[in-house]
Amino acid sequence: MAIKVLVVDDSSFFRRRVSEIINAESRLEVIDVAVNGKEAVEKAKRLKPDVITMDIEMPVMDGISAVREIMASVPTPILMFSSLTHDGAKATLDALDAGALDFLPKKFEDIARNRDEAVSLLQQRVIQIASKRAFMRRPVASSTPVQERPQSTLNRPTTGLRREASAQAPVSRAPVAAKFRASGKKYQLTAIGTSTGGPVALQKILTKLPANYPHPIVLIQHMPATFTAAFASRLNSLCKIQVKEAEDGDVLQAGVAYLAPGGKQMMIDGRPGAARLRIIDGGERMNYKPCVDVTFGSAAKIYADKVLSMVLTGMGADGREGARMLKSAGATIWAQDEDSCVVYGMPQAVAKAGLSTEDLPLERIAERMLVEVGLA
């Protein structure tokens, strides 16, 4: 049976082209369209589609409000279309907070010209998130920052990210699970790579880490260039640790998370205790910018077995070769488990290659990290 899709957009051109692309895939079927958020909510309740594609800026009711209402009444996998602007990035992150599973940049030119890459990407994303209807969840954390965290020696511009903290993200009451035990290894770096579903996963994990987290964290999230600064700023306002978009020359410091900038590659240079980040273009041959393999590979060279690494939810296999290099250096590699992933691609690639020592549910990754680094 075909996957039923509701297409929501106030642009008649975009509704038509998206519908044509979706219907061109035999496994997908557009069952209806909506021109605003209010109509989307009504049709979601009545038609119960398997997936909804949703614009953000619409009359009557915007996409973010529609996502909130749909998630409260008839939880459905939602794929957002977002403009590649700073405001578009912030709105997209709001939509993910509200419960949307993923987003795609809204590129009219690519859609209009029926470019193979854009067509294939849209079809794949719809198919991937359709499998997660049972996975649907409520918003992960308030975006209202609270309390000042302790001052850090991190050197930032005065116009940079605010040093604010938040209460921990709510944790669902899970059945009593086995207690974790530390391996006894010593670490100097934490490295986390992710893609589809990553913004929510990273928020769940990082908001549970204390300000005294004992070493630097490098984050590689597949995301457009205009999105990473907004995402880093949001995480920074919610977390007790500090989070910033990485800049070339940043000296890695304990208790600070560095998010790889979109459209660039992030590498680590120097030696443990005095390592710096190098932000480079990385060339056109790379499939992902940023690329998890690139950062993981450089971490293996500098920190060897002193890396605690994780591959989280995401499409494809980025991270597998980097994890292989880390494994050869004696580092620790964990993978997010299938049940808690939005897309079980990247973690599956690592697990199937025999590179991960543990496969963990998202809700327990932060707990496992704190045990492993001696904070719990």
From Swiss-Prot:
Localization: Cytoplasm
Catalytic activity: [protein]-L-glutamate 5-O-methyl ester + H2O = L-glutamyl-[protein] + methanol + H(+); L-glutaminyl-[protein] + H2O = L-glutamyl-[protein] + NH4(+)
Protein name: Protein-glutamate methylesterase/protein-glutamine glutaminase 1
GO molecular function: phosphorelay response regulator activity; protein-glutamate methylesterase activity; protein-glutamine glutaminase activity
Function: Involved in chemotaxis. Part of a chemotaxis signal transduction system that modulates chemotaxis in response to various stimuli. Catalyzes the demethylation of specific methylglutamate residues introduced into the chemoreceptors (methyl-accepting chemotaxis proteins or MCP) by CheR. Also mediates the irreversible deamidation of specific glutamine residues to glutamic acid.
GO cellular-component term (any): cytoplasm
Organism of this sequence: Vibrio vulnificus (strain YJ016)
Keywords of this entry: Chemotaxis, Cytoplasm, Hydrolase, Phosphoprotein
Name of the gene encoding the protein in the UniProt record: cheB1
